[in-house]
Structures are given as C-alpha cells and as structure tokens.
C-alpha cells in the first residue's frame, strides 16, 4: 500500500515537474513570439498613401494614417488642410492658398498650426479691425483692390501688415508664427496673406499674394536617425518647443530621404546609350577640367558661400518688407496679378514680343478689359533689378507730360518684375526712319516729333525737382502713338539729378553712338549729356542713317562724327535723307539747314558749348511754327508733302526764325562754303563756340575755368 502510494507520489511529482516545464516553455514561447511579432510588426508598419486623384505626394506627406504629415483628400481630389487648399510642397515648405475674406476670424487659422507645420516668418498677414498700428506696413484699400480684384469689401477698412522680424542669420532656424502671436496682434480679422521668398543668389524677392508659407518638420532631432543614407538632415526649432528635423537628399541624389532611399542620379552613358569611346572622352574632359579648376576656386567659393549663407535670410526678409511697403504706399500705380499678365501675353509668347531692351524684354498684351498694353519683363533676378523696377515706378508715377510714356501698372508677384505701359501702335521713330515700318516720314512730321521729344526732355530737366536725366535718349526710345505724337520711353537708366552740383559721378551707361563722349571719358553726368544724345537723334531725323553702321567708310561709321564733319564744312545737302529731297521747297530746305545747325551745337564735345534742352525745345518750336501749316495726310508720299503756300512763297533769305535769318549759299564743288549767319542780336554761328554764358543758364561745370 505504502509502495503504491509512494509510486503515485513519484508519478505526481513527475507530472508536476513536467507541468512546470510546460509552463516555462509556454512562457518562453509567448515572450519570444511577442518579440518576434513586434519585430515583424516594425517591418510591416501601416503604409503611407500619398495619392489623391492624379496627384502623388512624396513621403512624409500623404493622406492616410501611415503618413507623418497627413492632408485631407477632398471630393474634388485636391489636397487640403482643413478648408485650405495645398498648392505646393517643397523640401522645406508647404504653400497653402488663403483667398481674401472680409470676415475671417483669427481662430479660423487654427488648422494651419499643426503638430508638424506652422506659418513661417516669411509671410505677411493682412489684418483688419486693428486697435493699433502694427510694426509692419500699412496698405491702402485701393492697392488691395488693384491686386486682388476686390469688389465686396468696405473701401474704408483698415488693412495692416503683420510680420515677424527676422533676427536670426541662420538659414536653418526660421521663426514661426503661433496662434498666440496672431491673437496678440490687436486685430480681430485676418483678411489674407502674402508669402515671400528669395529668388537667386542676390536675394531678389518674389511675392505671392493670397498664399501662406508653412514650414514643416518631423518630431525629434537629427540624432533620432530617421533619415536614410545619402541625406542631409536639418534641425528645426519648432514653435512648440521640442526638437524637429527635415531630411533631404544630397546634391546628385534623388528620393524622399525617408522610406525612399536617396540614390545617385544615373549618368547619361549607361545601358543602350553606352558608347565607351564617347563616354571615355567626356569623362577625361570633365575630370581634367574639374580637377584643374577646383583647387583654384575652392577656398574663394567657400568663403563667399559662407558669407552669403549667413546674410541672405535677413537681407531677403528686410527686402521683402521694403518692397511690400513701397509698393503698397504708392497707390497711384495699379498692381496686376501675375496670372493676368501671363494670360495677356499668351505666356510671354514669342509672337507677342515687341523687342529687347537693356534690362528686359517688351511684349504686347491684351488685358481683361480688352485694352492693349506694352509689358516690359525685367530679366535680371538680382538686387539691382529690384531697385531698378522700384526706381522706374517712382519716376514714371511722379511725372506727367503728354509726350512721356505713361505707366499703367506693374506686377511684383514673381521673381521677374513686370512693368505695364500704354501701347504705342505706330512703333518707334527708328523703325520709320530705317523704313522698317512704313515708307518714311515727311519732314513736317519729323520736325513735330523732334519738337515734342525736346519738350518732354526739357520737362524732365527743368520742371522736376530734383531734375531727372534720362541717360538713354535714342530713336528706339521715341515711340509714336495713334496720331504719330512722340512718347519718350524707357526710364530704365534714369537717375535723379542733384541740385547742389551740376554733375553726378557714375559709371557710363547708355547706347553706343548716343553716349556723351565727355561723359564717357570723365564720368560726369549732367543735363548736357541728354542734349548730346538728342543731337544724335536730330542727325538721324535729317539723314535717315543708322547711328552706327560698319558698312559705311571707316571715317563715317559713327553718325555723330559724320554729321559734325558735313555740317561744319557746309555739306549738309550731302547727308539729307533722299526721301526728303524729292521735291524740296524753300522753307523746307531752310528749316532742315537750321535744324542741322542746332544738331551741330548739341553735338559739341565740351558740354558747356551745348545749349540746354529748354533752348533746344524753344528753337525747334519756332522753326516748326515759322513757315508752314500742318495740313497733311500721313498716307501721302513724303516727297509730295510741302509746307504751306505762305512758306513756299517766301525766299530763303527772308525766312525768319526767331531773331535769326539763315542764308543758304549755293553748294560749292569743294563743299567748303560757309554758312552765312545774319542775326539781329546774337553773334553766334555754326563755327563760333556755343558758350553757355551767352544764352545758357547752366554755367557751373568742370570746364567753366578753362580759358577759351
């Protein structure tokens, strides 16, 4: 009995031991299985769906739970953040549309402040109902009406800019807005916003109206190790206080830097395109050139790169605020949306191109109101171009003269600033003188254009305070409207004169053949520099010749030198445009000679020997009114257009112009006959120096003390 009990106990003990072993094995299986399950789960996380309709976004953006930055896919298959449409995503920004709304509350902006994104300091919010003036700019309602095409808002509304000051010079620590910041703005309504960014290495600024720029990040610093291989990790100081980061592929690699590893871009010489000798030759050339130049430029390039990297963000921020303030403050100029400009020119089509100027290309365009305009697109994306467009806007909006081209508006939304002018259907004076358009202009019309142009330039010199010097007067900058009236254009090289001195030291700018020779040598700019350029235009009007023509004899390549030589030696008739010589009457021939004498004085080498533009305009007006009545048809041949009978019946010797009477002698074979000048009160002639002390008020020049 005892033995049986003992045996039973032994069996029970063995069973218990086996049971414990089974329990241990089960626990081991559960632990190991759980570990294996977790590892498997880690390798098979919920995927990120980056597709919305026909759009596919790269990770970390997407539309499902597996995406670190999740957007909504609307019924219209467009990415959304709440009620705001996502317009673009880049390696560091999310661009969201923010259309104008007169009643939008600040709290409605909550969806734009997420766990992984927020508006950056590269925005300027347009606020309404502000209790105090914001630190940013103040925008007039008319400006917003022009840019945003508003119709429903109260025109008396108080619109102010609200921006963050960029105090950091580091590219990687851009400041962010917060809801608390907006609530503390003392404004109750948020009307819209303007996003800006730097374009190009010299910090040109592009403004995007009705847009918000959001900076994005993933949680954790770069030490979290979420970036894939061949990436550059950027630490982000988030507005929430915790660390954030962004991953981006290195130069020469492509991918998203996270789930899609960055792979090196494939070279051209590969696969079916592999031609060993061709690739080997290219490789040797590339490697040799790279190695040879790299060591020479590396240190210098690195120095400038570091310097620009530290200064660009702050300069960009301040430039954008300055541009916005200046643009908004000048309510007399309309601001056109970039989309309207692009549509007006058919996407800046070659068919709409009118010509190429010193700083940009001019296109013909048709606005939404069916008005034809000339659109000048500046091509330089640098700080000089930005200053250039603001300078031209200020100049053109401050002048008002019937013979100066009128600025209708501008566009500063994109990197290329755009100016919009009134359209001139009859082209330029140069086109008509060179017969590129029409069959030539009659003398009476040429004289009218010259007179109107001189009056416009004289207005810039004498009626503006300080005076404005054009610096690029030429026949291609003299436009003709529907009635062939002159319109002086292109203030791209204009500079404001200084009242305390008669010259400005600056680098010579302008067009070869028109540039003041004294200015080119001495770097002194004055009103007389424009007088010289206009003298070249007068020579063009008389001769119909090109200003610089290498097909002419060597001594006659430059029209100014040719005109001075022929006029000074009494051979004016040799250079008169043949189309004017078909049937000249006495007054026409006399007036051509008188204008030639005026051109001769304008082309004097020394500036103090030239007349002022006011004197030039007065003399041309006297010539124009002296002997003819403008009754002509522009469709008639130039040679058949004469002066009036009153002018034709006069003898040349009796043709009085002001206080002068010009006697035109018979042309001698040696072409050395002098021009006899009979004057009631003035001893001045073509051969005598034109001294400013005799008739010009501008006597204070650098050459004033040179003995004559």
UniProtKB/Swiss-Prot annotation:
CDD domains attached to this UniProt entry: STKc_IRAK
PROSITE patterns for this protein: EGF_2 (PS01186), PROTEIN_KINASE_ATP (PS00107), PROTEIN_KINASE_DOM (PS50011), PROTEIN_KINASE_ST (PS00108)
Topological domain spans for side Cytoplasmic: 307-708
Chain segments annotated as transmembrane: 286-306
Domain Protein kinase: 348-629
Highest taxon above the source species: Eukaryota
Residue intervals annotated with topology Extracellular: 43-285
EC number(s) on file: 2.7.11.-
Subcellular locations according to the entry: Membrane
Record-annotated active site: 472
Biased composition (Polar residues): 692-708
Basic and acidic residues compositional bias, start-end: 643-652
Signal peptide: 1-42
Binding site for ATP: 354-362, 376
Residue positions with a glycan: 43, 88, 101, 131, 158, 167, 184
Membrane topology, as annotated: Single-pass type I membrane protein
MF terms (GO), sorted A to Z: ATP binding; protein serine kinase activity; protein serine/threonine kinase activity
Pfam families assigned to the protein according to its UniProt record, in alphabetical order: Pkinase
Chain intervals for the UniProt region annotation (Disordered): 636-659, 686-708
One cellular component (GO) term of this entry: membrane
Gene3D superfamilies: Phosphorylase Kinase, domain 1, Transferase(Phosphotransferase) domain 1
UniProt keywords, alphabetically: ATP-binding, Glycoprotein, Kinase, Membrane, Nucleotide-binding, Serine/threonine-protein kinase, Signal, Transferase, Transmembrane, Transmembrane helix
Catalyses which reaction(s): L-seryl-[protein] + ATP = O-phospho-L-seryl-[protein] + ADP + H(+); L-threonyl-[protein] + ATP = O-phospho-L-threonyl-[protein] + ADP + H(+)
Function field: Serine/threonine-protein kinase that may function as a signaling receptor of extracellular matrix component.
Family: Belongs to the protein kinase superfamily. Ser/Thr protein kinase family.
Name of the protein described by the UniProt record: Wall-associated receptor kinase-like 14
Naturally occurring in which organism (per UniProt): Arabidopsis thaliana (Mouse-ear cress)
Gene that specifies this protein: WAKL14
């Amino acid at each position: 009995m005892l033995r049986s009990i003992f045996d039973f106990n032994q069996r029970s003990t063995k069973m218990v031991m086996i049971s414990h072993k089974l329990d241990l094995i089960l626990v081991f299986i559960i632990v190991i299985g759980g570990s294996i399950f977790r590892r498997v789960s880690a390798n098979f996380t919920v995927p990120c769906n980056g597709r919305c309709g026909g759009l596919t976004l790269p990770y970390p953006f997407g539309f499902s739970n597996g995406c670190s930055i999740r957007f909504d896919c609307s019924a219209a298959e467009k990415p959304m953040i709440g009620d705001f449409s996502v317009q673009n995503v880049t390696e560091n920004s999310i661009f969201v549309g923010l259309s104008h709304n007169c009643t939008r509350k600040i709290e409605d902006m909550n969806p734009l402040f997420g766990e992984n994104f927020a508006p950056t300091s590269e925005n300027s919010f347009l606020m309404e109902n502000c209790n105090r003036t914001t630190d940013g700019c103040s925008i007039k309602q008319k400006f917003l009406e022009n840019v945003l095409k508003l119709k429903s808002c109260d025109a008396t509304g108080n619109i102010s800019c609200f921006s963050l000051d960029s105090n950091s010079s580091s590219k990687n620590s851009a400041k962010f807005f917060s809801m608390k910041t907006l609530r503390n703005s003392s404004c109750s309504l948020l009307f819209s916003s303007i996003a800006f960014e730097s374009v190009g290495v010299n910090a040109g600024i592009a403004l995007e109206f009705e847009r918000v720029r959001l900076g994005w990040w993933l949680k954790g610093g770069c030490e979290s190790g979420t970036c894939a291989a061949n990436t550059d990790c950027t630490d982000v100081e988030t507005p929430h206080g915790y660390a954030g980061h962004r991953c981006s592929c290195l130069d020469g690699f492509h991918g998203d830097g996270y789930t899609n590893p960055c792979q090196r871009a494939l070279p051209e010489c590969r696969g079916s395109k592999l031609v060993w000798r061709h690739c080997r030759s290219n490789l040797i050339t590339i490697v040799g050139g790279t190695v040879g130049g790299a060591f020479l430029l590396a240190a210098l390039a690195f120095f400038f790169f570091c310097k620009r990297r530290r200064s660009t963000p702050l300069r960009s921020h301040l430039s954008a605020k300055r541009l916005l303030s200046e643009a908004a403050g000048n309510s007399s100029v309309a601001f056109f949306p970039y989309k309207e400009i692009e549509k007006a020119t058919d996407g800046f089509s070659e068919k709409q191109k009118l010509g190429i100027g010193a700083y940009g290309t001019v296109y013909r365009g048709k606005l939404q109101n069916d008005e034809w305009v000339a659109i000048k697109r500046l091509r330089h994306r640098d700080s000089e171009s930005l200053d250039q467009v603001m300078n031209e806007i200020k100049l053109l909006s401050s002048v008002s003269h019937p013979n100066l081209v009128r600025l209708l508006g501008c566009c500063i939304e994109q990197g290329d600033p755009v100016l919009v002018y009134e359209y001139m259907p009859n082209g330029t004076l140069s086109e008509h003188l060179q017969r590129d358009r029409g069959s030539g202009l009659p003398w009476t019309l040429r004289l009218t254009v010259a007179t109107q142009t001189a009056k416009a330039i004289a207005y810039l010199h004498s009626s503006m305070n300080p005076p404005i010097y054009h610096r690029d007067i030429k026949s291609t900058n003299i436009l003709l409207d529907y009635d062939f009236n002159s319109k002086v254009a292109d203030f791209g090289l204009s500079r404001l004169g200084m009242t305390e001195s008669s010259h400005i030291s600056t680098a010579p700018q302008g067009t070869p053949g028109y540039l003041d020779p004294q200015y080119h040598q001495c770097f002194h700019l004055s009103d007389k520099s424009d007088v010289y350029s206009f003298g070249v235009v007068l020579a063009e009007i008389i001769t119909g010749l090109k200003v610089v023509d290498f097909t002419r004899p060597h001594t006659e390549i430059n029209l100014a030198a040719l005109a001075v030589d022929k006029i000074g030696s009494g051979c004016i008739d040799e250079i008169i445009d043949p189309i004017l010589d078909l049937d000249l009457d006495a007054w026409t021939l006399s007036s051509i000679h008188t204008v030639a004498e005026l051109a001769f004085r304008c082309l004097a080498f020394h500036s103090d020997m030239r007349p002022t533009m006011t004197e030039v305009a007065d003399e041309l007006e006297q010539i124009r009114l002296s002997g003819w009545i403008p009754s002509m048809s522009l469709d008639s041949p130039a040679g058949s257009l004469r002066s009036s009978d009153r002018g034709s019946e006069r003898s040349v010797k009796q043709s009085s112009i002001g206080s002068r009477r010009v006697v035109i002698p018979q042309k001698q074979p040696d072409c050395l006959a002098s021009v006899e000048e009979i004057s009631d009160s003035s001893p001045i002639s073509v051969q005598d120096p034109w001294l400013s002390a005799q008739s010009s008020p501008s006597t204070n020049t650098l050459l004033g003390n040179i003995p004559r």
